[in-house]
Structures are given as structure tokens and as C-alpha cells.
């Protein structure tokens, strides 16, 4: 925490004419006259201004100056620190002085106020005009408040409570029981119902407090009124329905006399008085509409009750664009959206100049670095938004090409200083590497290099802002141009002396390639200055080896370029080949494949950056080289042109490629098997794991085959074990028979000796009356051998998820192929037709292509000839060519049963949003739906011709852009994590600062912030700070839901962590509630059908919770449900099923339900005998259970019969009695017995009933002897 001297108290005096909004009954004078704030002295004045822009007392003031105590204006002081301004004093007084509006400032005020009035929905972001975002659901989960535990209470609780019990109230127990039963009901619901409910997000949290606020049709201001100070006119409709015509003037706003049919901008009279001029729109509307004030207060209260992450708009990212969107996307009338462009005062932006200038800002202080990073993150995001909008205009045919006479795919565009081009092999650069496919791959690889450069922020090296936009099969590359490269240099006019004809030609640009590949000259060029710059940190950071190409020395790839722009900065371009070629893959799947149709689509198969860094780190660790030394000496570097340029080789590149194939990919499989990585929830989750480990998605097939091979080996080992168990069981039975015969013989012999001695009148020796002395070496003790099991929970989800990803990615490429030549309006017809062919042939066996527009007849397009069978054939071919994977048998059958899992994957990859409505995959589903309608609606209902229609979907862009992450935040996080064990306080402080800086740079609504909160929650939990851990994890969930989606793996992972934390904090209701949400998602996508371990994990936790709240009957229900689930996926003969039956037997026996317990244990014993063997410990224990319970039940029945016989014999009429465990008294179950040993349980049961019969004891003794 900061020292007092580092804090300054900033007192802001407010203007006296302020009519700031008052909430409730507050004190008047002082609070309205000034506000007091506290800041660190190193904070800038801009931080004060930022706070004033959101503070309730000042947020409606948008046009003012600050004056210091001497009356001097603080103009251009935003970047000064408060320490400089206050002369290091502890108090600093400033006054807020309002300024007269000009048109620009008045417009700014209207737009700012409009956001505060509820017109800025939290579901809107920079791409809302090209894709739909939806609202939140997490904040609607009725989670109980986080339990706070003081150390004193915790120690007391630990002393008093039983080992398995939780400190919960009776009310909590009831709520938990109800929630678990609700979870059972969720499991029974249809998958399409679960998904429809899951994806049906709520309406916007932010709701408008006015009906509308627009510019009046009387704009622009007539010349006569300009000199009277009129700036513009507004038309506002209040919630009461009253239409207000408002005039904006330098001193504020007033209601004028205009109507919809008459223009009179003079002040309106109210009760004989001229209406007041109000400086803010809030004051004007508050005086005119009671509902406005009420709704503003209600909205602000709603904000106060919610976490800010629920409603804030994204600043440096975009919201998730889900594959299922509300059936009727709302789009209320708002003329201001179109009117605002006519008041655009912003000059045309030069993103490149802004971007390069930020790199050159001095960052000598921490605050300067943070400010630089914040601007950098904001700029890259704004570029992405602008580039995407520009690309979409071009794709929709609204752009003007620089070369309009060229074919569409060759056209280039320059709009708002952003250069656009279609990605393809236009110059035949990749002619021998796959053509357009290679060019498309290289664009991704170039962007990866740029992302790395952005993080490194190397001095003197400049690159271009870049965004890739994929839409409808076309890819557009948007970049900031190199300064001067596209600028016209003038023209040259030449005259033909013979014909006297003049020819006009453009002069060539002075800006040209100085280093690397000069495409115009078809050669590699060298520049010493460029070489020096690149040979330092650039080469070391990317581990590049200096090499010679065409007699020229180069640091980077011979395909890359170095250009000095007109701004004299050194730019590097075309950096795709910076990373090495995956030479092993390229040779095997491209070079050595003779048949063109079986070649991998391209040879641009590079290694990912993560793999290079992992390999490099492994090398220095194995060779025990210091990190600094390895970096400075550029050890373990590679030649980026190796195997790319004929004749250029490098063994290091081969080594990296083998490292990927022979070590990393098998290790990823093993990590899944060992539980080091959780089973993937979906394809995106698997892809994330691949990428973090540096594995390319082209290895999906190899990965799936490795997992299949592991599954085959385990199944073979299991079958071999079962066969061996049969042999061992037979041997054991023979041994047991012979051993018992031996004992019987020994007993007979001893008895004969005793009889002889007795007959002779001799004393019987002690050794003849003691227990038989048996040789322990002859006894076969129960085995504790580890069971041979098949890891279905780990292996099957991996295979099925990999296959799903292969199928959906193959379909993405097929859709790209057919949509590439289509106009945007026809693409939905292609999507709906393909979906109908795949999933709708049961409903309509012969779906037709839907017509979309008379001017675009669908008959002229190639995709119309597709059929269900040919489409499946194409998918199979793509799977083989792109992923080297054979889809076997009737592979599509399971996707027809659960279509939405595959549909979701296709939509997310190609860019499709479907309406969240009822889709009919069979006529039976249609009839079921019709029967659910009332009679009147049923009569009017018109059944759809096909499952999917053009009207059901929209196509959206898929965007890849530079993802900026705060270096300062990462540095602090690394420092904090490294010292957390030695110095907890300082470590946590550094981690908190790291997240604080990350929020300041990227804003709180960012996936990287969510990831940090999730990790922080784990750290706090390990330190025993459960309440804080839960709070952090909840915040992570809220962010992930908005940024990644309600059904994203990131959110599922965070929810799973949250449930574990709530479990540790003894909040069973919260745990069950979270699990219900998880079950809704994973069951809706059919993960229960692919053996995903999340289900068994949830049931196991619920059983522990049930016992923890002393509800053994609920624990029995949970175990029965788990048993039913295991039967549905594995049948009734699996080992896990036997363990569940054994657990059930324990619980039922503890509940005195002996017959039921015996039935469960018999099943367990039978499976244990088959799977583990007769002489395994678990089998022996189960057999002991069976013997003990059988004798116990027999003993109880005998005594009961004896009592009845005695009663009948005595002739007495039997009187009704209250049984100790009768129905008149509620039975209580002791859950503490659930995990006791067999001996302990039997002792408890016998002792409780007072039935320690000799029969039972003999039975137990006999059982022990047999063992």
C-alpha cells in the first residue's frame, strides 16, 4: 500500500449553476459545491478528468476547463502528474469552469448524454453492424453470497464438525436437495430444448430512458439564426410520449416552440414564463419528464447492483458473436445512427502514422509505459474495427477500386488510409507450393509474426497494422500502407515522333525495396543499415541465422522485404516465412506424393511460434546453457530459407520438425491420459491446447490416430486381462478347494488325537486346543494389483472431438470453395442448402436450393448439383487430404442424431448465425410441435418446406487481427508468481498490480483479463483465501461469457473451477447451481454420449456434498443416477459401475436397508470377480459383504420367526408395537458410515440391532479363514 505522502487529495469545486442529479435525500450545499477525490501523486491530470467523466456529480458536464487555486486554467496539462501540479503537497484544489458550447462540443455532449440515457446497449460493439451480439446470463444465476470465514470461526468449526460434514443450515440443506433434483430433471430434457434455453440470452441490461433523441428535420440551422448562436436542433420524445423540440445554443439547451409542421426555434413559454436554458440535457429533461428521472435512477440503481463487467461496453475487444441468436433480433428506430455522419468533425485518420508515433513515445517512467500501452491497445482495436468495416463494404460491392478494370480478385482498394487486397497467388509466388491455398496460409503466418513483433516492440523496426477478414469464401487483407509507397509520383508524357501520339505513364515511386526480395527486379537486395538493425534484437528474438541467398547476406527470409518509407522509418513486410518449414510434414505429404489429388493442399506448412520457443527452451535446458548467454550469442538459430529455396538446407530445421512429430504430439496425448490437461469440451478447446503446445491443426488426423492406437492397446490389454482372470479364478478355486480339504484333514487328525487322549484319560496338550497353525506361505492373500482398465473417459472424448473438428473444418473448406464466386446475397442459400442436405433429408428427402433474388438465379451456380451422398464424399476426401484421416463406416450417423454439435462447429468456423428457433429434423418433430400449439394457432400454422431456410441465418465475417497484450502486466505477473511462496504479501500485491495495469490497457472486458482473474482465483485458493478466490473466479466467468460466449470452453472451464471453489467454501447450493448450468451446456452438445468425464466428476462431487450435508438418501439418489449414466454409455459390466454398486451397498446398509444393500453388493462382487479376479482385495471384500449381509438378514428373519412362533404358542394376541426403525418414526441415516470398512460397517450394524449372533461371528470367522 502507498505511503500517505504518495497520496494527494483533489478537491473539485463545482459550478454554482449545476443542477446535478440528486439520488434520494442527501445533504445539499457542500456535496453540490465540491467533491473530494484521492489519487496517487504520480497519476496524471487526465486520470482526474477520466473520473469526472463518470462521477454522478459531473458526468453530464462535457465541456469545461479546470482552474487551479490561483485562477490559472489548466490547459494542455492533461499529461502532467499531480505531483508537478500540486508542488508535492497533500491537497490540490481545482475549480470546474463551464465553457460555452460550439457545434462540435454540443454534439459531443448530446452523444455522451445519450449513452448515459440508456441508448448505449451493452450488446453493442464496433462490429454490431456486421454481426449480432447477445446479452449475459451469468449475472442471472441466483448464486448465494460468498461465505466469509474468520480464522477464529474456522478453527472452532474444525474442532466441532465431523470429518465429512459441512457447516450448513437446514435451509441450505433443503435448497441443495431441491437444486440437485432440478439437475436430474435437466439431464432428462431433450438436447435441442437445453440448447434453445442456454442460447436464449436475456434482453439488454441497459434500457433507454427516452423513446428517442434525434436531430430535428429543421437542421441545418438557417442562416438567419446562426448569428443568434443556434448550433442545431433536437427532437426528443419522452417516455410519456411528449415530443420536445430543443434548440442548442452556446449556453446550453432550451425547449423551443417548433412543432412537426411549424418551425419556430424561439424559447417556449411555460405558465407564462420563458423556458429556462439548461446547460445539460439531463437538467432540461429532468425538468420536463418525471418518468425520465425515475428511469435514470432505476438504471443507475441497476448498475450499482451489478458487476460492471455485466454492462460495460468493450473498449479493446469485441463481444462474442454466437452461432444461435434471438429469434427476432431487436433493432429499434434510432435516426441518430444515420444522422451523426453529417456532423463528422473528425479528420481522416492515418493509422500508420499514429501507430508508428506511439512506438516512438518516450517510456522512461512506469506511468508513461502504461499510457503508451493503453493507446497502443486502443489503436490496434480501432484499426481492426475500421478495417473490418471497410472490407465488408468492399465485399458487398460498395468500394471503389484503384484498378477497376482488373478482375475482382486482383483489385486493390485504398480507403481511409487503409490498403485492401484480396488474398491469392496473384503474382504466382506460390505457384509450386499450392497457389491460392499457400497464399491464404501465408497470410495467417504473417499475422503470427506481426503479433510477436507487437509484443517485442523492438526499436527501429517498424511493421504494418494488419487485419484479415474472411467472409463468404473470400479473404481480404487490410493493412496500413508504407508511407509513400502508394503516393502518386506524377506522370511522364512521351510523344511518338512518327505518329505524334502522346503516351501518359506514371513515374515509378522512389519508395522501393532496400533489403530482401525485390519482386520488380526479381532478385534479393542488400542494405547495410537494414542488416544492422535486423541482425541485433530481431534475429535473436526469432532465433534466425544469418545466411546467403543469391550471393546476398540476409537475416530474415528471402521472401520478406525491407522498405524505407517516406517518413524515413524502416519497415519490414511479408514476414510469413520467418518461422521454419515443417520439413518432415512437407516431404511426406507434399513433396513425396506423386498423385496431385492426394497431396496436401499446399507446401506452406510452417512451424508455429509456440513450438519454436518450446524447442529453444528445451535446448538450453538440456544443454544447461544460461538463458542470457543463449539469447545474446543467438545460439540454436535456424535458417528460415532452409528447404524453401532449392539447395538450402539446415539440420536445425529438421530437428525442430522432428521435435514436433516425435516428442510434442505424443506428449500431448500422454498429458491428456495423465490428467495434466482436462478433456476438451469442444473443438475450440482442443485447438487451444494444440496451439499452446505449438501443434498445427493439420495434425488432427495424426493425433486422432495416436489416440485410437492407445485405445486399441488398452482394449487388447483389457481383453488379455479378462482371459487371464478366468484362468486365475479357476486356479484359485482349485487351490481353495484343496486348501480347505487340507484344513479339514488337519482338523480330523487333531480331533482324532484329542479323542485318543481323552479315551486314555490323559490331559489334552494346549497346542491341540489352540487355533490351527497354518503356514502363511501357503495362503493366497488377496491381491492389490492395479486394475487393467480402458481409459474411455480420456480417450473417447479426444477421438470424437478430433473427428468433429476434422469434419467441421473440412466442411469449412468445402463451403469456401463453393461460396468464393458467389455474391453475398446468394451465400445464405448455399448454407441453408448444405445444412438441409446434411441434416434435413429425413424431414425432406430432396431439398431444393432456395431462390433469393430474381437477378441471381440459383441454377447458374455450381453448388446446386450437390447431393447428400456427394457432400459426404467431399467431406471424406477433404479429411484425407487436409488431415490425413480416414472417416470410417457410417461416420455421419451420430451427427444426424445430435446435429447441433456439428452445426455449431461449422457456424463458428465459417461465420454463420442461426435464429434460435425450433428446427424440425423429422416429420415426427414437426407433428410434436404442432400438437403443442393451441387449436387456433395450429390451424394457421404453415409447415416449413425444409429444415433450414435462407430466412433462418445470416453470414458474418471471421476476423484475425493483432492481439495486443500488456508487457508491463506480464512482467509484474511473472515477478509476483515467482515470489508468492516466499513473500505472500508482496507477491499478491504484484499480481494485483498486474491485473490492474492489464485492465487499464485492455479494459476489464477482455479475455486476457478473464484468464488472469481465473489464475488468480487458483492462487488465492491455494493460500486458503477462499472468499477472495470465489470473487475473482465469478468475475472471470462474467467476462468470459460476454467475450467468448455462453457455451464457450473458456466459460465451462471457469465454471468448473468456480464449482470447486464453492465446494471448498462449503456452499453446496451454489455448487449444484453451477453444475446445473454446466450440465445444460455439455449435455445439450451431446458430451454425455462421448464418454466425457465431466459427468462422472459432477456426480462424484454431488455425492460428497450430499454426505457433507448429512443427506445420505440424496447421496443414494445421486449414485443411482450415476449408475444409470454409466449403464447408458458402458453397459452393466464395467468396473466403474461395480464401484458405484459397492458404494450404494455401503450407503444402503448404513440405512438398515439390508436386502437392497445385498442386491447391490452381489452385482459388484460378480463384476469384480470377472474384472479383477476371485482373489482380488475388492472381490474378497465384496464377498465378505455378501456373506455378512446374508447371515445378518437370515439371523433377523430367524429371530422374527421365533418371536411370531412364541406369540402364537402362548395364545396371546399380538399388539402393535413401535419399531425402532418403524414408519412412525423418521429414519436417520449415518452418512459417516458410507466410507467405513466392511468390518466396521458390519460391527456397527450388528451392534445397533443388538444381534451379535454366533452365526454371524462364525460366518465372519469362516470368511477370514477362507482368505
Curated annotation (Swiss-Prot):
CDD domains: CLU-central. This is Clustered mitochondria protein homolog. GO terms for molecular function: mRNA binding. One of its GO terms (cellular component) is cytoplasm. Residues 1203-1219 have a biased composition (Polar residues). One of its GO terms (biological process) is mitochondrion organization. The keyword Nucleus does not apply. Its main location: cytoplasm. Belongs to the CLU family. It comes from the Eukaryota. Keywords: Cytoplasm, Repeat, TPR repeat. mRNA-binding protein involved in proper cytoplasmic distribution of mitochondria. The gene is CLU1. Residues 1203-1267 are annotated as: Disordered. It comes from Candida glabrata (strain ATCC 2001 / BCRC 20586 / JCM 3761 / NBRC 0622 / NRRL Y-65 / CBS 138).
Amino acid at each position: 500500500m502507498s505511503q500517505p505522502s504518495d497520496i494527494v487529495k483533489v478537491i473539485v469545486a463545482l459550478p454554482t449553476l449545476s443542477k446535478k442529479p440528486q439520488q434520494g435525500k442527501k445533504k445539499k450545499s457542500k456535496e453540490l459545491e465540491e467533491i473530494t477525490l484521492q489519487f496517487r501523486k504520480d497519476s496524471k491530470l487526465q486520470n482526474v478528468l477520466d473520473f469526472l467523466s463518470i462521477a454522478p456529480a459531473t458526468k453530464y458536464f462535457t465541456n469545461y476547463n479546470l482552474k487551479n487555486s490561483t485562477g490559472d486554467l489548466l490547459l494542455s496539462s492533461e499529461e502532467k502528474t499531480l505531483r508537478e501540479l500540486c508542488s508535492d503537497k497533500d491537497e490540490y484544489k481545482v475549480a470546474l469552469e463551464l465553457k460555452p458550447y460550439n457545434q462540435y462540443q454540443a454534439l459531443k455532449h448530446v452523444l455522451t448524454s445519450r449513452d448515459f440515457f440508456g441508448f448505449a446497449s451493452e450488446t453493442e460493439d464496433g462490429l454490431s453492424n456486421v454481426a449480432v451480439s447477445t446479452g449475459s446470463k451469468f449475472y442471472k444465476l441466483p448464486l448465494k453470497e460468498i461465505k466469509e470465514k474468520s480464522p477464529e470461526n474456522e478453527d472452532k468449526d474444525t474442532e466441532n464438525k465431523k470429518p465429512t460434514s459441512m457447516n450448513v443450515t437446514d435451509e441450505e440443506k433443503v435448497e441443495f436437495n431441491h437444486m440437485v433434483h432440478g439437475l436430474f430433471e435437466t439431464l432428462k430434457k431433450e438436447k435441442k430444448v437445453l440448447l434453445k434455453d442456454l442460447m436464449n440470452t436475456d434482453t439488454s441490461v441497459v434500457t433507454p430512458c427516452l423513446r428517442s433523441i434525434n436531430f430535428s428535420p429543421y437542421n441545418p440551422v438557417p442562416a438567419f439564426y446562426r448569428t443568434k448562436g443556434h448550433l442545431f436542433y433536437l427532437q426528443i420524445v419522452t417516455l410519456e410520449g411528449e415530443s420536445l423540440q430543443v434548440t442548442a445554443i452556446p449556453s446550453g439547451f432550451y425547449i423551443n416552440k417548433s412543432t412537426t409542421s411549424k418551425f419556430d426555434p424561439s424559447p417556449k413559454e411555460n405558465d407564462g414564463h420563458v423556458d429556462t436554458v439548461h446547460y445539460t440535457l439531463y437538467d432540461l429533461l429532468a425538468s420536463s419528464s418525471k418518468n425520465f428521472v425515475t428511469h435514470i435512477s432505476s438504471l443507475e440503481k441497476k448498475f450499482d447492483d451489478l458487476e460492471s463487467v455485466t454492462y460495460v461496453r468493450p473498449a479493446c475487444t469485441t463481444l462474442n458473436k454466437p452461432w444461435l441468436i434471438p429469434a427476432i433480433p431487436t433493432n429499434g428506430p434510432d435516426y441518430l445512427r444515420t444522422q451523426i455522419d453529417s456532423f463528422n468533425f473528425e479528420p481522416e485518420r492515418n493509422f500508420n502514422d499514429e501507430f508508428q508515433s506511439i512506438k516512438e513515445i518516450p517510456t522512461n517512467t512506469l506511468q508513461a509505459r502504461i499510457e503508451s500501452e493503453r493507446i497502443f491497445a486502443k489503436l490496434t482495436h480501432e484499426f481492426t474495427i475500421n478495417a473490418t468495416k471497410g472490407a465488408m463494404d468492399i465485399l458487398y460491392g460498395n468500394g471503389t477500386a484503384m484498378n477497376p478494370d482488373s478482375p475482382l480478385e486482383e483489385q486493390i482498394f485504398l480507403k481511409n488510409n487503409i490498403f485492401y487486397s484480396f488474398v491469392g497467388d496473384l503474382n504466382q509466388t506460390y505457384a509450386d507450393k499450392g497457389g491460392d491455398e499457400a497464399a491464404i496460409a501465408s497470410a495467417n503466418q504473417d499475422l503470427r509474426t506481426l503479433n510477436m513483433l507487437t509484443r517485442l516492440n523492438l526499436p527501429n523496426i517498424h511493421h504494418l497494422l494488419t487485419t484479415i477478414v474472411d467472409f463468404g469464401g473470400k479473404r481480404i487483407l487490410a493493412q496500413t500502407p508504407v508511407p509513400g509507397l502508394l503516393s502518386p509520383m506524377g506522370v511522364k508524357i512521351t510523344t511518338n515522333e512518327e505518329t505524334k501520339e502522346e503516351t501518359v505513364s506514371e513515374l515509378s515511386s522512389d519508395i522501393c525495396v532496400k533489403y530482401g526480395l525485390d519482386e520488380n527486379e526479381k532478385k534479393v537486395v542488400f542494405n547495410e543499415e537494414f542488416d544492422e538493425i535486423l541482425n541485433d534484437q530481431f534475429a535473436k528474438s526469432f532465433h534466425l541465422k544469418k545466411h546467403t541467398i543469391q550471393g546476398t547476406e540476409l537475416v530474415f527470409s528471402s521472401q520478406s522485404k525491407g522498405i524505407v518509407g517516406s517518413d524515413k522509418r524502416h519497415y519490414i513486410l511479408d514476414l510469413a516465412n520467418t518461422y521454419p518449414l515443417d520439413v518432415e510434414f512437407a516431404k511426406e505429404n507434399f513433396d513425396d506424393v506423386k498423385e496431385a489429388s492426394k497431396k496436401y493442399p499446399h507446401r506452406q506448412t510452417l512451424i508455429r511460434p509456440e513450438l519454436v520457443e518450446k524447442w529453444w527452451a528445451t535446448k538450453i535446458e538440456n544443454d544447461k546453457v544460461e538463458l542470457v548467454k543463449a539469447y545474446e550469442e543467438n545460439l540454436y538459430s535456424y535458417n528460415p530459407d532452409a528447404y524453401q529455396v532449392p539447395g538450402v538446407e539446415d539440420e536445425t530445421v529438421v530437428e525442430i520438425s522432428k521435435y514436433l512429430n516425435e516428442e510434442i504430439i505424443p506428449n500431448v496425448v500422454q498429458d491428456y491420459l495423465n490428467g495434466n490437461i482436462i478433456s476438451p469440451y469442444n473443438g475450440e478447446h482442443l485447438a487451444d491446447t494444440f496451439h499452446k503446445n505449438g501443434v498445427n491443426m493439420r495434425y488432427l488426423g495424426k493425433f486422432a490416430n495416436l489416440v485410437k492406437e492407445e485405445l486399441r492397446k488398452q482394449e487388447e490389454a483389457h481383453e488379455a486381462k479378462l482371459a487371464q482372470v478366468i484362468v486365475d479364478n479357476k486356479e484359485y478355486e482349485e487351490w481353495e478347494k484343496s486348501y480347505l480339504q487340507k484344513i479339514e484333514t488337519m482338523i480330523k487328525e487333531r480331533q482324532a488325537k484329542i479323542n485318543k487322549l481323552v479315551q486314555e484319560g490323559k490331559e489334552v496338550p494346549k497346542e491341540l486346543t489352540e487355533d490351527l497353525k497354518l503356514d502363511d506361505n501357503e495362503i493366497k492373500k488377496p491381491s492389490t494389483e492395479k486394475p487393467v482398465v480402458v481409459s474411455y473417459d480420456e480417450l473417447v472424448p479426444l477421438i470424437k472431438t478430433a473427428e468433429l473438428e476434422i469434419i467441421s473444418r473440412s466442411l469449412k473448406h468445402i463451403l469456401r470453395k463453393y461460396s468464393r464466386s458467389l455474391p453475398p446475397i446468394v451465400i445464405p442459400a448455399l448454407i441453408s442448402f448444405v445444412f438441409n442436405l446434411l441434416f434435413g433429408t429425413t424431414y425432406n428427402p430432396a431439398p431444393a436450393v432456395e431462390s433469393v433474388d430474381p437477378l441471381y438465379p440459383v441454377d447458374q451456380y455450381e453448388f446446386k448439383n450437390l447431393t447428400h451422398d456427394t457432400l459426404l464424399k467431399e467431406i471424406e476426401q477433404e479429411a484425407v487430404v487436409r488431415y490425413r484421416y480416414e472417416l470410417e463406416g457410417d461416420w455421419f450417423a451420430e451427427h444426424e442424431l445430435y446435429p447441433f454439435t456439428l452445426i455449431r462447429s461449422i457456424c463458428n468456423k465459417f461465420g454463420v448465425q442461426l435464429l434460435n428457433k425450433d428446427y424440425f429434423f423429422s416429420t415426427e418433430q414437426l407433428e410434436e410441435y404442432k400438437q403443442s400449439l393451441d387449436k387456433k394457432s395450429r390451424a394457421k400454422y404453415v409447415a416449413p418446406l425444409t429444415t433450414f431456410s435462407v430466412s433462418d441465418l445470416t453470414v458474418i465475417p471471421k476476423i484475425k487481427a493483432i492481439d495486443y497484450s500488456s508487457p508491463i502486466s506480464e512482467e509484474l505477473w511473472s515477478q509476483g508468481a515467482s515470489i508468492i511462496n516466499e513473500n505472500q504479501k508482496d507477491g499478491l500485491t504484484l499480481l494485483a498490480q498486474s491485473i490492474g495495469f492489464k485492465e487499464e490497457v485492455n479494459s476489464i472486458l477482455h479475455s486476457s483479463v478473464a484468464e488472469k482473474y481465473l489464475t488468480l482465483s487458483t492462487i488465492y485458493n491455494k493460500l486458503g483465501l477462499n472468499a477472495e478466490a470465489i470473487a475473482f473466479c465469478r468475475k472471470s466467468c462474467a467476462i468470459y461469457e460476454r467475450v467468448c460466449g455462453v457455451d464457450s470452453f473458456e466459460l465451462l472451464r471457469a465454471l468448473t473451477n468456480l464449482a470447486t471453489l464453492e465446494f471448498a467454501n462449503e456452499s453446496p447450493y451454489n455448487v449444484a447451481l453451477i453444475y446445473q448450468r454446466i450440465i445444460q451446456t455439455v449435455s445439450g452438445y451431446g458430451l454425455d454420449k462421448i464418454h466425457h468425464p465431466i459427468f462422472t466428476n459432477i456426480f462424484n462431487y454431488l455425492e460428497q456434498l450430499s454426505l457433507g450435508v448429512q443427506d445420505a438418501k440424496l447421496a443414494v439418489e445421486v449414485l443411482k443416477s450415476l449408475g444409470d449414466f454409466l449403464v447408458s454409455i458402458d453397459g452393466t459390466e464395467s468396473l466403474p459401475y461395480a464401484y458405484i454398486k459397492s458404494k450404494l451397498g455401503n450407503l444402503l446398509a448404513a440405512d438398515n436397508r439390508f436386502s437392497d444393500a445385498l442386491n447391490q453388493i452381489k452385482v459388484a462382487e460378480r463384476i469384480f470377480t470377472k474384472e479383477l479376479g476371485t482373489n482380488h482385495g475388492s472381490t474378497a471384500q465384496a464377498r465378505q459383504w455378501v456373506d455378512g449381509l446374508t447371515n445378518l438378514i437370515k439371523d433377523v428373519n430367524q429371530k422374527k420367526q421365533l418371536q411370531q412362533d412364541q406369540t402364537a404358542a402362548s395364545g396371546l394376541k399380538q399388539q402393535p408395537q413401535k419399531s425402532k426403525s418403524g414408519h412412525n418414526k423418521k429414519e436417520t441415516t449415518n452418512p459417516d458410515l458410507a466410507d467405513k470398512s466392511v468390518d466396521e460397517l458390519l460391527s456397527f450394524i450388528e451392534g445397533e440391532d443388538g444381534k451379535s449372533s454366533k452365526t454371524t461371528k462364525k460366518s465372519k470367522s469362516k470368511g477370514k479363514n477362507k482368505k
